[in-house]
Amino acid sequence: MNAFVEEAEAVSTAMSVEDKAKVTKAGADVFAKEVEAEYKANHYRHRVTGEDPHLADSVIVQNSNVDGMKNGNSTVGFSKDKAYIANFIENGTKRPMYTSKGRKYKRGGQVAINGDHTIENLRNNPEVMSKVVEAQAEAYKKIIDKRNKQ
């Protein structure tokens, strides 16, 4: 019985950082495809942008955390050039209330862009999360099968 418990702990809690990164990367790739599809469906204009890619084409996946440290996490986001645009779409904007000199603007505080909350809605969507979990389970199964062969 103890051998079974030790084997289960070795597979689950004692995973190496590389194995955790493989599992989370599989889920992050699926989520990135969903983000790209959602932005293409709702915010894409079919026009020639030249060398400047559209926001939907700027979704990136990195196999590290937000700070760039490899600890088994994977991050989905946008390139540096487009992240601020995604923030405007996600959260919306308001006009400033006061000028730099402290005077109040005529229409201060009015909403200029309504937030779309695309990424938040995708995170809360059970269909998308089930796809992410399935991809992670497939990667996890490959790691377990590889360990069992050794």
Language model feature labels by segment:
Residues 67-92:
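Mid-chain, well-packed structural core segment of small domains
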Residues 1-73, 98-150:
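Short, Lys/Arg-rich flexible segments
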